[in-house]
Amino acid sequence: MDSNPDGKLILVVDDEFDVLSAYTMLFEFRGFRVRTAANGAEALAAAQRERPDIVVSDYMMPVMNGADLCVAWRADPALAAIPFILTSAGILPRDLLPPYDLFFRKPVSFDTLLAAIHQLIARPD
């Protein structure tokens, strides 16, 4: 599972430019196409322009955080079935139960994240 011959599209959402740059480079090296957004509102707009195969989003961001993005994502019939991975360097509030598929605490190893992505995009719709 080291490559992605189908060129699946990953939407990476994070307000830290270095994170976006690193993930873009690593995912593209593995054969994925990558789009990025700096907050949840930008991510929703990007997904309207080009529907991704999966989204990897940070939790703590300005404008619209990752939890609010996930709720809006699931409420949109065109996006609801797309797998959603939420990440955070902080601790999520105990009552935060948005309908994300997986959660990883940062820092998460790229190999762990990549394996989860392959698992989620390979599952039947």
Report the location of each language-model feature.
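Acidic catalytic/metal-coordinating carboxylates
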Residues: 38-42, 65-69
